[in-house]
Regions:
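Secondary-structure end/capping motifs
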Residues: 240-318
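Bacterial N-terminal signal peptides
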Residues: 10-20
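Conserved C-terminal helix/tail region of periplasmic/extracytoplasmic solute-binding proteins
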Residues: 311-338
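Pocket-lining segment of extracytoplasmic ligand-binding domains
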Residues: 182-274
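Short, glycine-/small- and polar/acidic-enriched structural segments
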Residues: 26-169, 173-178, 192, 196-202, ...
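Bacterial N-terminal signal peptides that target proteins for export
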Residues: 1-11
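Sec/Tat signal peptide C-region and signal peptidase I cleavage site
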Residues: 21-25
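Small-molecule pocket liners
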Residues: 41, 117-123, 214-215, 229-238, ...
Length: 338
């Protein structure tokens, strides 16, 4: 498989960095951040199978490395943890990555490690009046993982710019509120909640549609004109430079987890349910999602430049990358990203 060979070269390149680095002690612990939903499935498989621990052992780091997993509700809090040095690897959308890349170019230089997956995000509602985003009014409230900063918030602005004109890109922002995916679904399904709409990712987006009266207003792939990365992994340049073996081991483990998901979808679904304790979908429902061709687990970024260019045009980031690879470490530059 061409992509698999390319990713193998990624790992080889990372280990080349290891061999050229001067001998020094690397970190004794690594902290990785997950979010809610199957967008975190690669990390969940890594955690369950202890793939990172195995890769670290094989890398001969020279000192024990403890692996810690933490969970965040969105990219904003994750970015704070990266800035404070409390987080080694973040897992969040293209928006949070672009924000950090532009913000830290002159200091800690946060960059993308790889993409995690591409999945359609759905804006669902229980309001029968709302068939397009033009039907939203002040009476509506839209839940998403982070107002203004989450990938869902940015995609909503892109859709608004297309529907109402570029100068009206923020028209729907006052209707948005920050909630985790699980809490957003709970509010949407509660008839007495002021939150009547939810912009979210699988499995929550599909599970919501199983309930009577819920329908989809917008699909992120429609906004982007094709597949788009849901989550990326990112870290600081300093972490990569000072911990080359630990960094290379991460890439190796992440590649293994990605290949496992693509080859063993039912087992991956079981692992997700076992680790996450998520009650929003059954095993069979998860397998159906994982078999959906629109849901792809790939380390190659997709559709990132459309999001990042919009962010730059509207002042969300001060500098715009010329190509997607400007935001990512060189180990993945050979992948077919967009």
């Amino acid at each position: 498989m061409v992509l698999s060979r390319r990713i193998s070269r990624v790992i080889l390149a990372a280990f080349t960095v290891v061999l050229s680095a001067s001998a020094q002690a690397e970190v004794s612990e690594v902290t990785l951040a997950k979010q809610f939903g199957i967008g975190s499935l690669t990390f969940i498989v890594m955690e369950h199978q202890k793939l990172y621990e195995k890769a670290l052992a094989a890398a001969n780091v020279g000192n024990p490395v403890a692996v810690h997993w933490v969970k965040f509700t969105g990219g904003a809090a994750m970015n704070d943890a990266i800035l404070s040095g409390d987080l080694s690897f973040a897992l969040a959308g293209v928006g949070p990555l672009a924000t950090m890349w532009a913000k830290t170019r002159d200091n800690i230089k946060v960059m993308g490690v790889c993409a995690a997956n591409s999945m359609p995000m759905l804006l669902n509602t229980r309001d029968p009046r709302v068939r397009t985003i033009a039907h939203f009014s002040s009476r509506d409230k839209i839940a998403l993982p982070g107002v203004k900063v989450s990938i869902q918030a940015i995609l909503l602005e892109i859709a608004a710019a297309k529907a109402f004109g570029d100068d009206q890109y923020a028209k729907l922002d006052p209707l948005t509120t920050t909630l985790s995916h699980a809490d957003g679904m709970a509010e949407l399904l509660s008839p007495n909640s002021p939150v009547d709409s939810h912009f979210t990712s699988p499995p929550y987006s599909y599970e919501e549609l199983e309930h009577v009266g819920i329908h989809t207003v917008l699909n992120s792939y429609q906004i982007l004109g094709g597949p788009g990365t849901l989550n990326t992994v990112y870290a600081t340049s300093r972490f990569r430079q000072e911990n080359p073996k630990v960094y290379a081991a991460f890439l190796s483990a992440f590649k293994e987890a990605t290949e496992f998901i693509n080859a063993h979808k039912r087992e991956a679904a079981r692992i997700y349910l076992d680790v996450s304790k998520d009650k929003s979908a059954t095993e069979d429902e998860l397998v159906k999602m994982l078999e959906n061709p629109d849901i792809r687990f790939t380390m190659a970024p997709e559709g990132t430049m459309k999001v990042v260019s919009f962010m730059h045009e509207h002042g969300r980031i001060k500098v715009e990358p010329k190509v997607w690879s400007d935001m990512f470490f060189p180990e993945v530059h050979d992948l077919p990203g967009t």
